[in-house]
Amino acid sequence: MMKLNWIIFVTGWMSFRAVGSGLFLFWIFTENERSAPSEWIIPFVGDFIIGITALFLVYHIIKKPSAILWGLLLSWNAVGLFDLIGAIDVSFAAPYGPIPEIGFNELTVRSILILNTLLQISCIYLLFQKDIKDYFKF
């Protein structure tokens, strides 16, 4: 089922949000020269929470689908989407390019945020498809 595989992939992909945000939060709290402006703390915390819960959700999607899990996925994607929209807003208010030497500048950060936003929107859309709802015994 291609739609389900896409949901699993995107949910797993969001685990990378914990890696990046964890590093950037560490830089902020250690006052590293590459640390983000303080406006980024809330989006980073949101990313970290979404990221660390992603792999748990992937496991349950594969092993224990249920109507409750469907609701959790919908909520999780909505919270993740809200966090990303906030981060996009912050990216304009307080631009941040952590590692420009490798091309990870303000534009790259904003592009990644927009990509992840589109991915989360696609999952929310797919969660309302009949075959996906049937899979979750909805």
Predicted features by range, described:
Residues 8-11, 37-48, 70, 74-77, ...:
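Hydrophobic alpha-helical segments of membrane proteins, primarily the transmembrane helices
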Residues 13-49:
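Hydrophobic transmembrane helix segments
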Residues 16-22, 76-87:
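Aromatic-anchored segments of alpha-helical transmembrane domains
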Residues 28-42, 86-112:
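Interfacial non-cytosolic loop connecting adjacent transmembrane helices
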Residues 58-81:
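Loop-to-transmembrane helix junctions at the membrane interface
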Residues 61-68, 124-138:
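Cytosolic juxtamembrane helix at the C-terminal end of the final transmembrane segment
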